[in-house]
Each structure stands twice: as C-alpha cells, then as structure tokens.
Amino acid sequence: MKRYKATFAGRIVLFAIIIAVVVGCVFGVSKFVKPNKDATNESVKVIETTKINKNETNKVPVASNKDVTNEDVTINLSLDEWIGWEPILYANQGFETKDGSIFDELGIDVKIHIINDADASSNALIKGDLSAAGYTLNRTSFLSGKFADAGLDVVMPVFTNYSDGGDGIIAMSNITSIEDLVSAKIGVPKFSEAQSMVVWFINNSDLTDEQKSTIINNLVLLDDAEQTGQAFFAGSLDVAATWQPYLSYAEDSTDSHILFDTTFSNKLILDGIVFRSDFAEAHPDVVSKFIDGIFIALEEYESDFDTIRNIMPMFAGMSDEDIAATRMDAGMMDYAANVKTLENDCPIIYSDMCDVWESIGETVNRSLSETLFDTSYVKDLSDKYSSVTVPAPKVVEITEEQRTEALDIPSMLTKSCTIEFHPDTAKFQDNAEAAAILDEFVEIAKILDGTIIQIEGNLNYNGKIYSGDSLSTKRAETVKKYFVANGIDANRIIVVGNGNSKMIVDPAGSVEDTMPNRRTDIFFKTVGA
C-alpha cells in the first residue's frame, strides 16, 4: 500500500512522467485471473538486518506452535511503505531498536521488516517468523479466513492512523454518482483497500441486486494503484479506485474529478497492528508498552524526516516538504481515539468489510470480530492517559453557501426508504419499525462522517403538484431528529419537503401501490470533492 502526496511541483513532474509512459507504449487493460491468495512464491522485498524466511510452497502454512514465552521478547513487526506508520518508525529509530529511542526507554525490543506483499507478511505471521504486522482493517477482514484456516488467532489492539484523503475514487467528469457506475469501466487494484471501498459503496447503494452484481463482476482488476492510475489517464478506464498521488492528478486534469476521497470518511480505511494472540497473551506488558511508545511518538515525530527516509525506500529521495505534504493524507490516532474506535467503530467496519469480500466470493471469519478488538492493552495505559478525553464525533463545518450548493449538486450516494407515519402527522406509526429501517442509514452516516446528508420527504397526493409541502418537510424533520438522537451532527443535515412534486407512480393506485410516493430519500453528498 504505497501512497503519498506530492507537492505541486512534484505533481507536475510526475504527471509528465505518466503522460510519457502513456504516449510511449500501447497500454492494454484486461481482467486478471484471480490469483491464489495463499500463494507466496513471488519475490518479496524485505529490508532488514535479519531476513524473514518466506514460505516456499503454494499452501497456507500452519500456525506455529513454538513456545513464545521461552523466546527472547522481541516484536518482529512487518510494515508496508505507508506514511501512517511513521510514529512506529520514530519510536524505534531504525530497523532495530536504537539505544535511547522511545521503545528502548520503555524497555522493549522491536525489529521492523518492510514487506509490501500482504500475502508474504501474513504467511510469515502464521509461521511465527513475525509476531505482528501492520494492516488496514479492510485487509485484516480479507485475511481473516486465511488465518482461521491456518488455526491462527490474532488481535488488533491498536490503530495508528486513518486515511484522510489518501484514498479515493476518480472518474471522468460525466460520472457523478454511484448509480453512474452501472455502465462505466471501473479499474481497481485487486484485493486492495481501494477495491473494498468501491464494493462498499455499491453494496450500500439503492442499485438493484442485478446491477450490483454486474458492476462487481465487471471490475477491471489490476496489479496495483500505479497501473490503475496509468490506465485511467491513458483513457482505458472511466473510473479508478486508487490513492495518492493519482487523486491529485485527477483534480488537476480538465476532464476528470474526484468522485470520493477519504476526507469524507475517516473510518473506511483504518491502519492498525495485528498481533499473534499467543504473543500478546504471553507478553501483555510488552504490547502495552509498544502502544505507549506510539502515543509518545505522536508528540515528537513531526520534526523528524530522516528516520522514514532511512527505513522506507519510497521516501528516500523525498524532500521535507513532500513528506510533510504526504502526512496530511493520514490522520493519527491517540489513546482517546483508539478507545473510541476499538469499542464503537471497528466492529461495524469489520462487518461491512466482511460483506464486501463475501460479495466478491471470498471466505472470511466473521466471528473474529468478537475477540479481534481487545481493548485491554490500550486500557492498561488508562492511568497515564486518563486526562485525555475521548474525542467528540467529527464536526463538519458547513456554511450557508455550501448548503445552497449541496441542493444543486448530484448525490454521490442515494438511498430511499418507506417509513409509515400516522395519517396527516409527522409521527412514526411504529417507532421500532422505523428505527430498524433508519439504523442502516445512521450507520452509513457515521462511516461517511464528512458528507452532507440531504433528507427529502415525499407525499402521495392526487391533485395539483406543489413543492415545499409543510407535512413532507415535517416528516423529513422527524427523520433528521432520529439521526441526531443517534449521534449524527445536526449541522450536516439538510431537510427538504417535496410535497407530491416527485411522485414516481400513479397517485390514484392502492395504498400499497403508491408507497413509493411516500418514500424518504436520503442523499450523501460530497461538497468540495
């Protein structure tokens, strides 16, 4: 998962390189045959002082039964090249724990291995060559079936960061919503966070099951984000799920735009550390100190640029300015954010990602969520961080100008529902039934925590068409109140009463036939994307 944001000057140079590549060759795109996700006989780049022994077979290794309690207590940790791991690098000050570093002062030993291939790192974790690995929650859910097949129990006790603009979906200018994807040629890096993001939106849309299957089955699977980005700018794709710097390129181009990026959701892609459960259970104090070291580093690392250059090759030639710009794509997570995320957000995101992978034919272990997010290691630090308050829900500052703009722009994601109200009132006919329907929408609103939510009430009325009906407005307000009562910032919500101006079936039909006219439409909009 290599992602970075170049400065403006860097973007010009890199974009010129992409154009040169496109002009200099005929770029073909085709669907890839799905690889065996358990195969590990590819060459793997491992940069470290002690080499990881990679699996030489095409089979999933069996979880090691070695007695971790009798080994030297060293955390063998794999990380891919991503800016979000920087506090860990800073706390260690090298591939091995440096004398006087944060981890050294805490009395723990960490060996960092740079492995960009999640297949290789997961096999090393299963075999016991690694005690921990850095993965997104998306990736962890993808690997959960593999871990279960190998008999490996894991825990994910800490998250270092969330993607905050580093990942997204770029599209041609005429594609403005998830619904527009039905006839589009969409490219994704196979089995990536970007692919999971696209499928998540499809799964949570109002598209028919047939339309969803068509889109998912026709995704163009590419090897990586670089190939996906190049295919998009070569004109071979209408839509590409990718990460930086390709989002910036789309923003700078004349006929493309960012359909969605993770500034509008700080929960869709979370980066954390997965430990073997046997290691964590045998050395809980070591795991807690490791987490403490991350939190300490958060206060210090931003003035240091050399450590990441020395450890991660992709940053070796980057200027301080470029590294600082790249940091903006990852929002760091402290003690309070971890407590909140582990307890409230992670089970929901994990379940959604299991839905994603199952919808494309992968096997996952849903029950892992019952033990994966063990808060005991973080909460062992509660005395030290007791003064750190749990962060309030993300506040989206929306100006009146943006509210007006939101009314006129297309919705990135639209969902409709039918809620029964008492006749001629704005009161739910059945509170429990209404809650069961709206809870799905509230969960989406919590995940897409940077979007504007437009709630529109509609009526069935066989008479003169009119807009702004007070009853439909009041019913939309009732739905808004439910959202607010369940933790959604009222400032994010726009209420519209359509009266009967947007009926979609004959209003003279039966009560059952005219239910679509009584629907509530909920739009998730990305103003400024």
PLM segments and residue spans:
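Periplasmic peptidoglycan-binding/tethering modules of Gram-negative envelope proteins
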Residues: 364, 377-452, 526-529
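Pocket-lining segment of extracytoplasmic ligand-binding domains
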Residues: 137-139, 147-148, 207-208, 212-316
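Extracytoplasmic/secreted proteins, especially bacterial periplasmic and envelope-associated proteins
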Residues: 83, 87-90, 116, 120, ...
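Secondary-structure end/capping motifs
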Residues: 281-365
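Second-shell loop/turn segments in exported
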Residues: 75-76, 110-111, 183-189, 236-237, ...
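Short, glycine-/small- and polar/acidic-enriched structural segments
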Residues: 36-222, 238-244, 267
